[in-house]
Amino acid sequence: MFLTGKLNSEATTRGKDATANAITAPAEKTAAFRMANMDKLFSTCGFDFADMEELIAELPTDHDMWEAPGFDRVLFHADPSGMAVTAMEYEGEWAAVPSYRGGEEAPGTIYRATPYIGIVETGDLQFAALADAPFALPAGNSVGGEKLRGQVRPAVVALKYEVGEPEEFTLTSPATERFYRNFKPSMLNPQVEVAGTIGGVAKHSNELGMGEFWVCDLDGLPLIVNEKLEVGQGIRAHGIALCATEFWDD
């Protein structure tokens, strides 16, 4: 698994001894991630690494933060392909999440619901996604709280999919729907179901990861897959939602 590690249970934007706006990561809050196929997620994004250690060893330090809220160190790298990765370290253990910065920006809101997951709202869509700078997001919950308003770049990485006849665009996040019913962030995960008609396909080479990936345009939403698909095909995919924010903009 690429997404592993520990966080300070009382780390905040004002220092690790404060308690407001805390980032927490007890075992039950990260269990959902370990159940997901994170190796498949990274390989589909073109990161051809054997494990976390190899990824961290190869990660450039062009964006290197020390003492980020909840973490001892944060590394961020934006690949020319549009793919990016955020690596976060606490007490010698690392976690990493990918993001895709090649899609179109859209106005939206996002808040942090768990250490790595943000709840994104843009247009008519509301879904949980892996966030590229979770430590910079305001803590919120399903019944209220602060949200960060700005430009977001959502994307979905397909873990499995089927192609067929053209379809209307839909995106559903069953875990987010449950979250707003039971108010339990421990059950939240970034897995989504998406369907639509492929409006365009572009091949990309991940220079850092040495792998290739394809981006399908589904009504403006980038759907990342590991092989070439045909324009005009309908697709139904189960995948993981990502969200790039303005935090890392130059």
Predicted regions and their residues:
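N-terminal alpha-helical "arm" segments
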Residues: M1-L55, R236
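Short, isolated positions in well-ordered beta-strands
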Residues: L3-T4, A95, F127, L223
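Long, hydrophobic alpha/beta structural blocks
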Residues: D48-V194
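OB-fold (S1/OB) nucleic-acid-binding surfaces
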Residues: I117-L125, L130, G199-L223
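Short nucleic-acid-contacting surface segments enriched for D/E, G, S/T with interspersed K/R
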Residues: V143-G150, I224-I240
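Single-stranded nucleic-acid-binding OB-fold domains
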Residues: K184-Q191, T197-M210, W248
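Beta-strand secondary-structure signal
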Residues: A195-T197, V215-D217, H238-I240
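Short, Lys/Arg- and Gly-enriched loop/turn segments at beta-strand edges
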Residues: L242-D250
